[in-house]
């Protein structure tokens, strides 16, 4: 599991007094930085390969300014050229949002998906998603 703590900013708060719903996709992307680092250790954007093809965000509770949030990211599935990420956002210990993101290892020059290299696949497996019952036993919920 990857974990990122984010301090909500005043500018991310909307007129209803909570964090605007357009902010969460940006936060979830920020939490994926360690995964991007696996695919792009030198951060060479000319050879970027991680292309998002789907993101499904479910809001569970409102999120507020003034209290840090914690985003936890797991690898849910690894295909030949794609991976599915499971992401959860917590504030004060409460689950506030769940996101699932699908990425493809895509070669922008050839415009084709490429197989995820074995060394990256092995590293991703270290962060594999456990089902909710096992996570509760481990104190992650």
Task: Please name every model-derived segment.
Residues 1-70, 76-141:
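Terminal targeting signals and extreme-terminal segments of soluble enzymes
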């Amino acid at each position: 599991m990857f974990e990122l703590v984010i301090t909500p900013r005043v500018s991310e708060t909307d007129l209803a007094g909570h964090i605007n719903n357009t902010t969460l996709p940006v936060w979830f992307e920020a939490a994926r930085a360690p995964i991007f680092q696996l695919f792009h250790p030198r951060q060479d954007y000319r050879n970027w390969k991680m292309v998002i093809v789907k993101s499904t965000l479910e809001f569970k509770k409102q999120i507020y300014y003034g209290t840090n949030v914690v985003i936890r990211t797991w690898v849910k599935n690894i295909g030949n050229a794609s991976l599915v990420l499971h992401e959860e956002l917590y504030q004060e210990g409460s689950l506030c949002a769940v996101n699932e993101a699908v990425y493809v290892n895509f070669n922008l020059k050839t415009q084709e998906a490429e197989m995820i290299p074995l060394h990256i696949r092995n590293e991703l497996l270290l962060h594999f998603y456990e089902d909710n019952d096992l996570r509760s036993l481990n104190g992650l919920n």
